[in-house]
């Protein structure tokens, strides 16, 4: 159990470091364009020394994790690939951010694909279990597809600012194709991979939470007049499945693991303590959704003409 705790903490710290690095270098390389477009930038007004120190500290700490994992080729490769993807996306002369499809692939790989694979390999390492090829493939397709959907949505949302700043992103280069690819190619791949993951998990908990999320999404759309969005931004919207992935799926997985090994209850408790607000809000919304569904189902239907 202690090795799983170490793995979980290592994953959290290692990915946070990479995320900080990605955010800083993206702001640094976008600074001139953001100022021209009147867009907020995180490093605007900061001293160059402070920014350079932050980058150096995150890179140094990241290499420490790489050294600790040097004996695990798959884990090390995926972790280093996370940093490489972020670097290729933002830094010249590569700057894949402005190279169309290469940019969205790079961002999705750095934000979702490689961190998800790091989590898989690290969990197997901590549990001292063999890695399942089918599980790795399912997680990889799901994470990459979700990452692609996220970056396409972001670029479509930010297209006016990118135009003002002169950034030629995938959404700017292909304004008609981007929504269609995200909706009719990427999203079905994401759903198929998610279904494969749920089948391999072999527990009723994640599908049950998914059904509850669907009830909430339908009720939310009706009650608050919000629009479900796959990739195309709309006024008063919510991104389909985002809250399930961020709030409910982790809890469902931990409950599943707790049923199989009661020691995991400690990890579940730690998760609830670390992210209480998200979990509480999700539970309240789901409870309200299911209650409303039950009430509607129990009410008699008054038919008639007129």
Q: What kind of feature is each model-predicted range?
A:
Residues 16-18, 81-91, 142-148, 211-223, ...:
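Alpha-helical transmembrane segments and their membrane-interface exit regions
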Residues 13, 31-80, 167-209:
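Multi-pass membrane catalytic core of lipid/isoprenoid biosynthesis enzymes
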Residues 44-128:
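Intramembrane alpha-helical segments
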Residues 14-42, 146-171:
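Acidic (Asp/Glu-rich) catalytic motifs at the cytosolic membrane interface
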Residues 27-28, 32, 85-100, 151, ...:
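C-terminal ends of transmembrane helices
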Residues 54-62, 107-120, 180-194, 242-252:
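Core segments of transmembrane alpha-helices
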Residues 105, 206-306:
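Extended hydrophobic alpha-helices typical of membrane-associated regions
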Residues 1-25, 73-87, 129-153:
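Membrane-embedded alpha-helical segments that form the functional core of polytopic membrane enzymes
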């Amino acid at each position: 159990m202690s090795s799983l705790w170490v793995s979980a903490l290592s994953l959290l710290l290692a990915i946070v470091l990479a995320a900080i690095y990605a955010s800083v270098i993206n702001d640094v390389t976008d600074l001139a364009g953001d100022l021209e477009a009147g867009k907020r930038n995180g490093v605007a007004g900061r001293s160059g020394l402070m920014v350079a120190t932050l980058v150096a500290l995150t890179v140094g700490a990241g290499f420490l994790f790489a050294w600790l994992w040097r004996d695990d080729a798959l884990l090390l490769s995926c972790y280093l690939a996370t940093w490489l993807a972020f670097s290729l996306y933002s830094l010249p002369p590569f700057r894949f951010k402005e190279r169309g499809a290469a940019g969205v692939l790079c961002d999705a790989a750095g934000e979702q694909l490689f961190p998800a694979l790091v989590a898989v390999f690290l969990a197997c390492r901590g549990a001292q279990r063999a890695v399942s090829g089918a599980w790795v493939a399912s997680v990889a397709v799901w994470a990459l597809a979700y990452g692609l959907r996220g970056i396409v949505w972001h670029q479509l949302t930010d297209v006016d600012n990118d135009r003002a700043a002169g950034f030629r992103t995938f959404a700017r280069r292909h304004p008609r194709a981007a929504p269609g690819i995200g909706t009719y190619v990427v999203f079905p791949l994401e759903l198929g991979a998610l279904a494969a993951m749920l089948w391999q998990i072999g527990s009723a908990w994640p599908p049950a939470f998914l059904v509850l999320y669907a009830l909430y999404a339908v009720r939310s759309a009706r009650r608050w007049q919000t629009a479900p969005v796959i990739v195309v931004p709309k006024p008063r919207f919510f991104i389909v499945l985002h809250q399930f992935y961020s709030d409910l799926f982790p809890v469902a997985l931990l409950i599943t693991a707790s049923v199989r090994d009661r020691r995991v209850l400690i990890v579940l408790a730690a998760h609830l303590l670390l992210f209480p607000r998200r979990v509480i809000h999700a539970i309240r919304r789901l409870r309200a959704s299911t209650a409303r569904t039950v009430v509607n189902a129990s009410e008699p239907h008054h038919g008639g003409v007129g």
